[in-house]
Amino acid sequence: EHLNVALQCGGSDAWSGITSNPSLGYAADLIVKNGGTAILAETPEIYGAEHMLTRRAITPEVGKKLIDRIHWWEDYTARNKASLNNNPSPGNKAGGLTTILEKSLGAAAKGGTTPLNDVLLYAQQSNKKGFLFMDSPGYDPTSVTGQVASGCNIVTFTTGRGSCFGCNPSPSIKIASNTEMYNKMVEDMDVNAGKVISDNKSIEDVLSLIHI
C-alpha cells in the first residue's frame, strides 16, 4: 500500500508493445490489486489509444478529464504549427514503429487492465490509490519529474532503443524490450523482457524478474 510506481518509457521500439510494456502492465495490475498505486503519464504518447483508458474510467467524469487533456495537447500543438501525428520520433521509426497509433497502443499497455481512478494535472498529488494517469509532455525526464512530484517513490522505465535515463530522487528499474539491446547496455538495464521473444518466456516469467 506504500508503493506509488511511475510507469514510464523512452526510446520505444516495435518490441516494446509486445514484451516490456505488457510485462510492466502486468506488474502494475498486481501492485494495484494489493493496495498500491501506479501512475501512467506522457499524454501525447497515448494519442489515438486514449479509448483504451477512458473505457476503464471509474466514472464518466474521470474519462472526460483525460479527453480534455488530449484536446489541450491537440490545441497546443496546432497553435505551434505542429501536430501530435508528428510522433513517433526518428529513433522510434528506426526501431520499427511507423505511426503514433502503433506507439500509443504499446505505451498504453504499461497501464495494465485495472480501473482508471483519476486523471491528474502535471505534478498534482492525489489521495486516491490504484491506477492513475498524470498529464505530462511526451519527454521522459520532464514526465518522470512530474510523477515523482506527484508522489511516486519508484520509477519503472521500459526502453527498446536504449536509454541511460536514471532518477536520483527515486529508485529506477530499467526494463529492456529486446535481448540485443539488453546485452549492449547491461550495466544500464535491470530486466530483460526480450526473453519473451529470444527465450520463449511468458509475461509472467518476466514479471518474476521485476522486483518492486
Where are these regions (language model features)?
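Short, conserved phosphate-binding/catalytic loop or strand-edge motifs used
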Residues: 2-4
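Glycine-rich anion/phosphate-binding loop at the beta-strand->alpha-helix junction
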Residues: 8-170, 174
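A hydrophobic, small-residue-rich beta->alpha segment in the mid-to-C-terminal subdomain
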Residues: 171-173, 178-208
